[in-house]
Amino acid sequence: MDYLSRRKFIKLTGLGFMSLGIGHFAPIAFAQTHVLKVYKSPSCGCCGAWVSHMRSAGFRVVVANIADLRPIKKKFRVAPELRACHTAVIDGYVIEGHVPAREVIRLLKDRPKAIGLAVPGMPIGSPGMEQGGRRDPFQVILFSSTDRLVFAEYPQQEV
């Protein structure tokens, strides 16, 4: 390899590594452009853990501690069968329950016509509900006033 081709090789290799790094941080950079407002009970630990999960993914999070969340869920049109412990809003979408950050990022990038995403109930192993390596299966539901579609599925995982 002569000097010129070595230089090109080093530059190209460096650019390749830089692009890998940029790709790794791209979701975080994207998330930082959006503010997530979370309505939760002041005493709920799993809601606080989900907030930490979202912050770790790069979201700017504002928390509103509210004793009775039923009026919030009704205001944001979350059907009773989709409800969980906390409700969040971001960029015109509702996020109900322990939705993984990567699904919220996908929602914001794809911008489907919907009210939002929900993980009904409180499935073990969903973000904020971690218990060791165990994960119960759960689905992330994309919902509108008339439809519900499976947006993502997370299979069961044992320790």
Question: Model segments located where?
Answer:
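Thiol-based oxidoreductase modules, predominantly thioredoxin-like and allied folds used
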Residues: V61-I72, E81-L82, I90
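C-terminal segment of N-terminal export signals and the immediately downstream linker at the start
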Residues: F25-S41, A49
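N-terminal targeting signals for Sec/Tat export/insertion, comprising classic cleavable signal peptides
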Residues: Y39-A64, K74
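Thiol/selenol-based redox catalytic cores and closely related redox-interacting motifs
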Residues: K75-V159
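N-terminal secretory signal peptides and thylakoid transit peptides that target proteins
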Residues: M1-L20
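Short active-site oxyanion
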Residues: V35-L36, F59-R60, D91-V94
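Amphipathic alpha-helical interface surfaces
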Residues: W50, D68, P100-V104
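Active-site-proximal beta-strand/loop segments in catalytic clefts of secreted hydrolases
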Residues: Y39-S41, I66-A67, H98, P120-M122
